[in-house]
Curated annotation (Swiss-Prot):
GO terms for cellular component: cytoplasm. PANTHER family: ARGININE--TRNA LIGASE, CYTOPLASMIC, ARGINYL-TRNA SYNTHETASE. It catalyses: tRNA(Arg) + L-arginine + ATP = L-arginyl-tRNA(Arg) + AMP + diphosphate. This is Arginine--tRNA ligase. It comes from Xanthomonas axonopodis pv. citri (strain 306). It is found in: Cytoplasm. SUPFAM superfamilies: Anticodon-binding domain of a subclass of class I aminoacyl-tRNA synthetases (SSF47323), Arginyl-tRNA synthetase (ArgRS), N-terminal 'additional' domain (SSF55190), Nucleotidylyl transferase (SSF52374). NCBIfam families: argS (TIGR00456). Its EC number is 6.1.1.19. The gene is argS.
Amino acid sequence: MKALLRALIGQGIEALRANGTLPADTLPPDFVVERPKTREHGDFATNAAMLLAKAARSNPRALAQALLAALPASDDVAKVEIAGPGFINFHLAPTAYQREVAHVIKQGHDYGRGLAGNGRSVGVEYVSANPTGPLHVGHGRAAAIGDSLARVLDANGWNVKREFYYNDAGVQIENLALSVQARAQGLTPDSDGWPENGYRGDYIADVANAYLAGDTVDLEGHLVTGTKDPADLESIRRFAVAYLRNEQNHDLAAFRVDFDIYFLESSLYKDGKVEEAVQKLIASGHTYEEGGALWLKSTDFGDDKDRVMRKSDGTYTYFVPDVAYHLTKWQRGYERAITELGADHHGSLTRVRAGLQAMELGIPQGWPEYVLHQMVTVMRGGEEVKLSKRAGSYVTLRDLIEETSADAVRWFLIARKPDSQLTFDIDLARAQSNDNPVFYVQYAHARVCSVLRQAQEKGYKYDQAHGLAELACLDDEHSLAVMLELSRYPEVVEIAGQALEPYQIAQYLRELAHAFHTWYHNSKVLVDAAAERDAKLTLAVATQQVLANGLELLGVSAPEKM
């Protein structure tokens, strides 16, 4: 619909150039066509006249009047009016929305998909949890947001690669290995001799027992077997990392999250990528030595202070491999790189970007892009749930899925802006009522399936072509409200992709479900008159399709029965 209105406005501007109202060399402005905040102001509004007023040497409202008069007639536009300082508001005819139903039916699964990305490459990194324990609910939020964002970008025509970065090097892995070794040697977290910074969850005992039993872990086709030797710390390290990576993969699969690339931090050292990044920075002239350490002049690139890259003992600070890792993304040809992180990583953003800018390789400012999420509080029975017996100190993603469902967890972890703190109410997520938004939306889809089954049971033969031809009979308030919501879907998908905000899909689906449920309660679908019945079934099927399309972008199922 936006495309139709933009075309009409463009023709009107050409007419004003032709009659001299606008200078002949006036370029069409980058005007906006958007939905007003309230329906009273029409279905769409444009600021075109306000942008052209200066060129026309006219006040915006007068030019808006001239542009309105120059607009070509269209059966899809019922009324056009001027508002405020020069906005032009369009009220669409019912035929415009009825035609959109036909577009939904024709395009099916492709309805709402766009070409904004034009096949360009984007790498989306998310979760990237240390392989030191079970995934917690914060990782779950990262997984839900990141996976849905990747789906939304794919729907906008981007060539998306999903990436998981494993921090499998450093002190945390050392602490993991020492913790498993202590368990393998018969110690418990309460014993004298337990590692000072060791991990204390019950899962450590699971890893130790599997190692001592000589179990084999199949990690993405790579077999790692426990050697049963509690003194072999290196074997324990390899086995523990493989075991816990495999556990994380199990949880992510249950959560309908997968990846194209698993990138290991250890490979950056093995393949010389860390040293390559350091040498590029030294060659750029943006480093200096002081106190036996190597420093990056990151203040030259917006950081609040210069950063140590290599300490006096020769080891690298943690942001250096981060810079090296993102350098590989650039070298792999990602036009865009998007990293989803917890808000507690905010401090690393500027220094990573500074490191990339300092290399002077033509990497754009603001590359990579970041999506930051806030923490999650889990509630049950009005009280906060803080611990998991298995993890020892936090609520795991597996716990949450087992208590509710993957659908509910994904929905609730996506459905708010990432930068807002989120409360996950287990009781609400389990409720089969309209108060539960995921139930409410899924029930709308299942309700359409139920109506189609009822039609078949009653012996009604649904003729979709007939229904499309008879949509004009659906001109009541509630039918048009559903059609209006259906027409919004492509815009919502596009905006969610531009803003990197998949939560907008969830908000939209709730509004569509509300419009559908309201229509259903106020309109008998299976009437005797075939024309009206087929038209209503066609509207229901179009709603079913858009609900399914949107739920797929969230990674939430569209059930046929509930």
